[in-house]
Amino acid sequence: MVNKEITFLINSLGGGGAQNLCVNIANGLASRGWDVSLIVLNAKKSVFHKRINKKVNFKILGTSNTRYSFNVLHNYIKTEKPSKLVVFNYELTVMMYFVRLVSLKKFILISRNINTISKKKENLKGIWIKYFVFPLINFFYKKADHIVNQCKSMQDDIVKHYKLDVKKTSVIYNPVNGIIEKHLLKYEIESKKEGYLLCVGRLESQKSFNYSIIAFSNVLKIFPNLRLKILGEGSLKNELIDLTITLGVNDKVDFIGFSSDVISYYSKAKATILSSLYEGFPNVLIESISLGTPVVSFDCKSGPREIIENGINGYLSNYLDVNDLEAKILLTLNKRWNYKSVAESAHKFKLDLALNNWETLLI
């Protein structure tokens, strides 16, 4: 008999892409008859817990972070005895390797790779992360039984970085948010766009919103009535606000913060802009095109090249080239888009396809 029991482990359910995906996959598998458990370390800034399907066994372990999680995780494994564990975090994967070692419990340890590992290594900050946490990750992360990557370029990167057997890895594209899919069953693609560009994500160095703001300030010379809306929170908010003041565009840039109504922002934007230094697989681009809004993105590692079809659903910009980013935004604003065709380009990212792939992996 097929064992359809699976446990997902993540640090929290804050407003990030990994957390969103974790809930979507857990809900989807539970709806397909799986015995699903979703375990989080803590409920800090929890955004997605209200969306968890009642069929999912949800448990909060009550520990502040991964560093202090060994005892509660060890107790959980001894008590619940999961057969398969999918972990959505580098540090947690390493911790679970040690828990398995000490507990002598046999379970399959699967890790979902959340970023382009080589780029993450290049952009480490902080003594604790750089000289202790990441060296541990670098040595022990590959001890997971299987690593799921969000796109082909991520898979290529991690196989090369760790010299892994490619059979120990797989690719499962992130699906379109289930809430967006439900929205699209009820409503037509929005054809009346409003006068703004959109950026979505954490206000942190990896997302490098400064490039988007600079490009936008130049685009204003051609489209003076345009606005830029930025959805997200983070430690660089004040620094980015200062940049808008320096560029003289602070009256044209709206820092919205976190919003639960992201569908409305995507649907009505003229375009969504992504200027990240690197990504795992940018859900922002998938969400935008699925709602019919074209995208402009740096050709960063990894993901944009596997999502964007130039002239069909948006444009790729040369990496870290703010002048080319500006040029591609202007190209997007001047083009007459078939918004339904933009949305159709997201077909390969449907939730059902992702769930099929997860089931194939887990059975």
At which residue positions do the language-model features occur?
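A short, active-site helix/loop in glycosyltransferases that binds the activated sugar's phosphate group
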Residues: 142-169, 176-178
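Conserved acidic donor-binding segment of nucleotide-sugar-dependent glycosyltransferases
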Residues: 309-322, 330-336
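A conserved mid-protein helix/loop that constitutes part of the nucleotide-sugar donor-binding site
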Residues: 16-24, 195-221, 235-241
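N-terminal strand-loop element at the rim of the active site
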Residues: 3, 8-67, 235
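Short His-centered aromatic/hydrophobic patch
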Residues: 87-95, 113-114
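Membrane-proximal helix-turn-helix segments that form the acceptor-binding/catalytic region
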Residues: 74, 128-147
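Short hydrophobic beta-strand element within catalytic cores of glycosyltransferases
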Residues: 294-298
